[in-house]
Every structure is written in structure tokens, then in C-alpha cells.
Amino acid sequence: MWRTLLAALLATAGAQYERYSFRSFPRDELMPLESAYRYGLDQYSTENWPESVSYLEVSMRLYRLLRDTEAFCHHNCSSAGPLTAPPPADGELAELRLLAGVLRRAQCLRRCKQGLPAFRQAQPGRELLEEFQRREPYKYLQFAYFKANNLPKAIAAAHTFLLKHPDDEMMQRNMAYYKSIPDAEEHIKDLETKPYENLFVRAVRAYNGDNWRTSISDMELALPDFFKTYDDCIAACEGSREIKDFKDFYLSIADHYIEVLACKVQFDITT
């Protein structure tokens, strides 16, 4: 059903984030992330390059939608804890107060997610999400773009993948070939660039050129978006978690909490 609905849109779709909007995501593109991605890979394996490109691009937008929606709900519910500072308590009363804050936040998240389309779809597993975090789809997009005779996007996809996998020999060879093409340099860009990154680079260039006013201005403009991106990445660590083992109540809570903390310590803001 969703393949039929999407057919007309895919024929004219641009790059994966052109016209992307968190608040007004096209209904015709809404589908399970895993379904879109697996179908794109199926078309890749049968060498149906235009169809593969279209669905791989849609899967990238769906992943961003899921990530942005998760961050939106967690930011909105970040204060849904204890209503006032509780007096010191011991034993069961302290435990109940702690759990009350957890339950209030859980209720807030549940209500938030119920009203957003990203969570009305079947949710992807952790392994698939990590594949997107590693920018693995760009490995397939690069070759599909190339076979579809779209060299500018193939070059950009190869560069975007190499930023996360600088030692990948196959992609290094592909990039070496692309760089031998006239005017290839203008297409070497990171398709996952955050808005603050361009401002920061511009600020550094102004700094190196002793243009202090411009450097200060651009750096000040970059900082708010950097901290927003940082907060969004941290919020993503508190997203859905697959429960594979049956454990005691406290062991389960402890494992989940440690997993979230490890994610926050180790996360990469460039993903």
C-alpha cells in the first residue's frame, strides 16, 4: 500500500533532506523506517538504481524524523519530574518519591509520542538505528547514485561516508576516482552537516585573518545551535531500548540507566 502511495512523490524527490520538515513531514512518505530501508536495499541488490535511491533517501528522512521527534518529546518532558523539592525522606517514602518523578515523565513522554506520526509506525531495532548512526546507508547511496549517473550526489555521499569511515579502502578508491573528474571538488560536501558547523568554520577563518568582529559574531551565532545539537544527541540516548533478558526489577533499571549514561559519555555529535 505505502509503495503505491509513494510512487508519484519518489519520481520527483530531491536529495534526502531537501524540503525536510519535522513539523510537516509528508504523509505519503510515512512508513516504517526498516521497511523503507530494506526495500531500498532489495532494489539495490536487483540493480534497480532509481528505485533504490528513492527509498534509501526516504529512509534517511524517516531516520531524521524519528531522531528529531525523540529529541522534541524528551526536551518537552525534561521538567516532568518532582513538582517541588521534596523534604528529606528515608526508606520506602524516598523510593516512592523518586518513582513518582519517573512516572510523571513517562506519562508526559507517552502523551507526546501518541500525537506524533513518527511513533505511529513500527519502531526500528537498536541495530538498525546504529547502522544509520554509522552512516552505513551512504555506502549504498554512493554506488546507486553513481549507477544512476548522478555524479554530484555520488561524490557527496562518498565524502559523507568517509568522514565516519576514513580507513575504508573501497570508498577511498571511489573518492580517488571522483577527484580525477573535472570540477569534482565543488561537490565534496558533508550531507549531514549541522548548521553551526559552517558558522564555526567561517568564524575560524575570520579569526585566522585577524577579522575579530566577524569571528566573534559568527561564533556567537554558532553556539546556540551547537548546544541544541548537543542536547538533541543526549536526548537520543534516552530513546527506546530493546529488552532481551528477563531480569529483576532493580537489575533491569540499573542496566538501562548505565546504558543511557554510557551513551551520553561516548556519543559523537557528528552523527
UniProtKB/Swiss-Prot annotation:
Pfam families tied to this protein: TPR_leprecan
Q: Name one GO biological process term.
A: chaperone-mediated protein folding
Keywords of the record: Extracellular matrix, Glycoprotein, Secreted, Signal
Q: Mind telling me which GO cellular component terms the entry cites?
A: endoplasmic reticulum; extracellular region; protein-containing complex
Query: Signal sequence span per UniProt?
Result: 1-15
| Positions annotated as glycosylated | 76
Its subcellular locations are: Secreted, Extracellular space, Extracellular matrix
Tissue distribution of the protein? Found in articular chondrocytes. Expressed in a variety of tissues.
Work out whether the entry's keyword set contains tRNA processing.
no
Record bears the keyword Metal-binding: no
The record's comment on protein family reads: Belongs to the leprecan family.
What does this protein do, in the record's words? Necessary for efficient 3-hydroxylation of fibrillar collagen prolyl residues.
Give the protein's recorded name: Cartilage-associated protein
This protein's species is Gallus gallus
